[in-house]
Amino acid sequence: MKVAVLGAAGGIGQALALLLKTQLPSGSELSLYDIAPVTPGVAVDLSHIPTAVKIKGFSGEDATPALHGADVVLISAGVARKPGMDRSDLFNVNAGIVRNLIQQVATTCPKACIGIITNPVNTTVAIAAEVLKKAGVYDKNKLFGVTSLDIIRSNTFVAELKGKQPEELNVPVIGGHSGVTILPLLSQIPGVSFTDQEVADLTKRIQNAGTEVVEAKAGGGSATLSMGQAAARFGLSLVRALQGEKGVVECAYVEGDGKYARFFAQPLVLGKNGVEERKDIGTLSAFEQKALDDMLDVLHKDIELGEKFINN
């Protein structure tokens, strides 16, 4: 199993690469790419960690040497948020980066599963889909927007509030991956109940958690370490499913039946070909239903922005 990380010299990429080097199954290959000249050195640094995961680093304008034979491609390349920016402010720079990298994926490893971490995910996934479609290699079961950070934050914040072990929780989060489009389904956590105020406050905290980190880092970065962990969780789940493990479930932002939007984050059963099943989002509380209805306009606009970037 070969995993390629594109954007591997950045804050998220390095954390992700470290976790993959220590946790990928024995015999896996890990390929690191970034435009930054430091990238081969990051690979050398990680190569000293005693695990049976082969690692190699590539830098420069061309990502294709890193992509040959990749089964999974995780893309975290791009600029990070600064105070006062929201994820959509990143669009102008990151849209072009994602387009260029996906063009190289389309020609080099068109059958790979692709996880997009680069924000704004609501839009960059649509960009990736349109590029792959133009290249004639789009498979909607193999393209994912990585929203796992919303899930791990939900698990953490609910555990803190309710005195639970975070490892025991798995809060489904649906919608998208920015602001109001992030919708944790707090009503679906077995054995945990909330007051209306707790639901409103928790939902808002989960939606704004990225800003909490950006502000706490005082201009020195965004959520890189927790995002690295979230991306590793998703990447490792995908690898397990591709290798035949049954019943692997993760939430991610994928193209589905279009009931709510062309792309929508929901719980997925992963399998040997990527998405095996898009699970139903279940029964929502009145609060959740209203939040879902209210976000769709924003989500549709985010998606349209990505489609137009490629098609106009």
Curated annotation (Swiss-Prot):
GO MF entries: L-malate dehydrogenase (NAD+) activity
One Pfam entry name: Ldh_1_C
Active-site residue list: H177
Catalysed reactions listed for this entry: (S)-malate + NAD(+) = oxaloacetate + NADH + H(+)
Positions bound to NAD(+): G7, A8, A9, G10, G11, I12, G13, D34, N94, I117, T118, N119, M227
Its job: Catalyzes the reversible oxidation of malate to oxaloacetate.
Stated name of the protein: Malate dehydrogenase
Source organism of this protein record: Serratia proteamaculans (strain 568)
Gene: mdh
